[in-house]
Amino acid sequence: MKKITFLKTFIQTRWLHHFKSREAVENYQKKQLTNYMDFLKRESPYFKNGVPSNFDHMDKAFMMEHFNELNTQGVDRDEALSLAIESEKTRDFTELKGEVAVGLSSGTSGHRGLFITTAKERSMWAAA
């Protein structure tokens, strides 16, 4: 776990993000979405040239179909899926490619999904 990231996120979540109005929340959300889209344009092969004109929405089927182009870590879907399935069987959740961990969604929709997280992201989730 990244302790500095954990502490920073915990402090921000606990003491610094107090919104006084709906407008303040919406402004914060817009800023965060802009930052996220800038990140995707820089890091995700799928979004390098912006949002495609035919892009409608993101669901599990779309994400799994375009996993290799969407993810920002260069992780191959088939490799990650094999590792995640093996990890589920053995209960050995070894990381893939350094700090990237792989997991599976429960598959309650009938289709299992794949997710990857970095050590930084896991620290932020734990703190929030």
Task: Write out the residue ranges for each language-model feature.
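Nucleotide 5′-phosphate-binding alpha/beta core
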Residues: 1-104, 110-127
